[in-house]
């Protein structure tokens, strides 16, 4: 999500392990996150989450509440685990996520029509206006 006072959420993004070995935990370990050969082996894909509108709305409301509760500003990524039963668990609030082009945060913004250059301009602008309360 992005913003200081006025918050905007981007498309929920998910990490999928397409070839998860049987019995292996569905957890993003450091090896899974940072080892390209292992990512290839287990079929790691990141993409827009396949959620119904009701769940997306619920996640957006929860995200805004958490963002404000933690006094976040500028931009942040909130990582969740959503159960098959629809329960939502916050795993991490990351106030400084990777913002490189073609990484999850930038891809989620692109999915909402915000290209990379515009995303960076928005982040810079929010930082410059932070102290003024804009």
Feature names for model-found ranges:
Residues 1-61, 84-89:
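Phosphate-binding site of ATP-dependent enzymes
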Residues 50-134:
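ATP-dependent carboxylate activation and anion-phosphoryl transfer catalytic cores
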């Amino acid at each position: 999500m992005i913003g200081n006072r006025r918050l905007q959420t981007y498309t929920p993004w998910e990490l999928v392990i397409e070839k998860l070995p049987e019995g292996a935990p569905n957890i993003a370990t450091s090896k899974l996150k940072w080892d390209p050969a292992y990512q290839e082996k287990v079929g790691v894909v990141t993409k827009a989450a396949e959620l119904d509108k009701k769940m997306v709305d619920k996640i957006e409301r929860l995200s805004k509440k958490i963002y404000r509760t933690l006094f976040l500003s500028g931009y942040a990524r909130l990582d969740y685990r959503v159960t098959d039963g629809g329960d939502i668990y916050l795993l991490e609030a990351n106030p400084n996520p990777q913002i490189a082009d073609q990484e999850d945060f930038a891809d989620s913004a692109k999915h909402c029509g915000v290209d990379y250059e515009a995303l960076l301009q928005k982040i810079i602008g929010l930082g410059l206006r932070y102290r003024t309360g804009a």
